[in-house]
Amino acid sequence: FCKNITENVQTIQHLHLPENPVSTASTAFPCGMWFTAMDYAEILTGKSEAEFRAAVQERFQQVQALGIQTVFLQVRAFADAYYTSTYYMPGLSMSADCSFDPLQIMLTEAHQSGLSVHAWVNPLRCQTDAQMEQMPEQYPISQWYADETKRGTWLVKSGDRWWLNPAYPEVRQLIADGVTELVTQYEIDGVQIDDYFYPTTDASFDAAAFAESGASDRSAWRKEQCNRIVQAMYNAVKQTNPKVLFGISPQGTLSGNEKQSADVQTWGQTAGYCDYLLPQLYFGFQNSTAPFAETAAFWAEQVTCPDVSLWIGICTYKIGQQDTWAGDGMTEWQTDSQVVSKELELLCNMDGI
């Protein structure tokens, strides 16, 4: 969807993807691509339905030609919705007079191109003060922002934006209702959440809820709140349509997930949390902190539940670039043009993936 889609396609064409694309999300070797809400802006903001549909058709035809089978479409990025929603305001990149449903168009065109669609949701991340003040009053998050008893508890500011606090059942219910709405209204193949859980380790974020809980271990308690929100979303999907998949795409390292209280080991080892884990292994083989081969092997050991599949997320945006935080592997992506090809080859031959 982005301006450099042609360049990206040319890059991906060298990655030895499967030659025979299939339309289901349960293939033995799933190959997918994420599209962010920011990617839509170029073809959505100020565009007519016909213009948007034509642009979507072009991009999905390119994606399908690569052998990619699944697209992960971000439908909620900042407490907004790129679909018709009772609970969330229209997407921030949608024009005020937008009269069509972006998700429905993308879903129709994807399925016609033989692509399965997973609706990608950020459940907790909200908006800045300026954006929150413009949010229509009919939506629950706007009402909570205006309520002094909810602002600072159910809805908490961290950095320059607001976040939902998963410690409250009303918050978890809103998020579950949003998932139910998606699965009820649209013939999607899956729902996915990514790596945004607790935005900070600062104890002030949820001090009141933690004090009320009577718990003594904040780290364990926060993990339990994340587990509750994940289970609520999983149950919302399965109770609405058991055939729809629910997946989680967490950070690529255990330490990164620990900082966000994301209990990835429980999710990979226990039924009832997700159908697949898709950790983001955006690393090269020479990365000092998280070398790709060892990190992939670590994840293969964590996902032991027979009901949970392990998929691996890799990146192409580092090709030809300096990997600033990679330590000894800082120049790997500049000196080796085959990093991604080697990663794919390793993954195809690794048990458990």
Model-derived features: positions:
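Active-site-adjacent "subsite" loops/lids of carbohydrate-active enzymes
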Residues: 23-53, 118-119, 124-181, 185, ...
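Short, acidic/polar
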Residues: 45-64, 171-182, 256-272, 292, ...
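Aromatic- and glycine-enriched glycan-recognition loops and surfaces
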Residues: 47-66, 91-113, 224-229
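Polysaccharide-binding and catalytic clefts of secreted carbohydrate-active enzymes
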Residues: 52, 69, 104, 146-270, ...
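Catalytic domains of carbohydrate-active enzymes, especially glycoside hydrolases
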Residues: 54-80, 185-190, 272-276, 347-353
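Aromatic-lined carbohydrate-binding/catalytic grooves of carbohydrate-active enzymes
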Residues: 66-100
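Aromatic- and acidic-residue-enriched segments that line the glycan-binding/catalytic groove
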Residues: 83-95, 125-157, 195-214, 328-332
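Substrate-binding cleft of secreted/luminal carbohydrate-active enzymes
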Residues: 269-291, 298-353
